[in-house]
Regions:
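Well-ordered alpha-helical segments embedded in enzymatic catalytic cores
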Residues: 82-92, 115, 143-144, 161
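Conserved nucleotide-binding/hydrolysis micro-motifs of P-loop NTPases
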Residues: 2-5, 42-47, 113-115, 138-139, ...
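Residue-level preference for the first positions of well-ordered beta-strands
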Residues: 105-107, 155
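Interdomain helical connector at the RecA1-RecA2 junction of SF1/SF2 helicase-like NTPases
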Residues: 2-103
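Conserved helicase motor "Helicase C" RecA-like lobe of SF1/SF2 P-loop NTPases
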Residues: 110-135
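Short secondary-structure boundary/capping segments
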Residues: 2-12, 123-126, 172-175
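Conserved RecA-like P-loop NTPase helicase motor core
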Residues: 130-179
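Short glycine-/polar-rich loops that comprise or flank the Walker A/P-loop
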Residues: 17-19, 32-36, 127-130, 169-173
């Protein structure tokens, strides 16, 4: 590639050499990005199969593909115990952040529209505030992204509709509730 400088590595392969590097720590120091923390949650999932046999699995431990799928389906069930606890913890975190950043917002990414609506109901119950819900088949949902981005409401719930390339700088807490 023209204008690219290459250097040989220890194995004799040529690697491109950057003229300038700018990483996350530089951007954080410059104040152009916010700090990112990933909170890990664990828990035990219990379910019954079609034959009525009860199963249990601990999230985060080695499982078969089928056990993993069933455990996540159980854990992400809005009517279960785990998601309400995760959402409540996320809201506690967001409320703490809003003491210093009053317009900080949170987002829940759901696996489907049914789950998104159910998570929105949970948020309404937990916070007393109706979240912004964005579903691809709802008229005006794209406008809601802009409204949420420019507003001060606390929570946004979407089904993979808000992703890379969508800029909502005030988002500070996220719950990725999909497998």
């Amino acid at each position: 590639i023209p204008f690219v400088t290459y250097e040989e590595d220890r194995a004799g392969f040529k690697q491109s050499r950057a003229d300038h590097t700018y990483g996350y720590s530089d951007a954080l120091a410059d104040g152009v990005v916010r700090p990112v923390m990933f909170m890990a949650y664990s828990g035990e999932a219990r379910w019954r199969d079609s034959a009525g046999e009860e199963h249990a699995a601990r999230l985060g431990e080695p499982l078969t593909a089928e056990q993993t799928a069933r455990a996540w389906k159980t854990a992400l069930n809005p009517a279960g115990e785990w998601m309400p606890a995760v959402i409540a913890a996320a809201d506690t975190r967001l409320r703490g952040l809003r003491e210093h950043v009053p317009d900080a917002g949170g987002m829940i990414i759901a696996s489907d529209q049914t789950a998104a609506r159910a998570y929105a109901d949970l948020l309404r119950t937990i916070t007393g505030e109706a979240p912004t819900v964005m579903l691809s088949d709802d008229k005006g949902s794209s406008d809601r992204i802009s409204q949420f981005s420019a507003g001060t409401s606390s929570w946004l719930v979407a089904v993979r509709m808000v992703s890379e390339g969508v800029d909502v700088p005030r988002l500070a807490v996220g719950v990725y509730a999909t497998s």
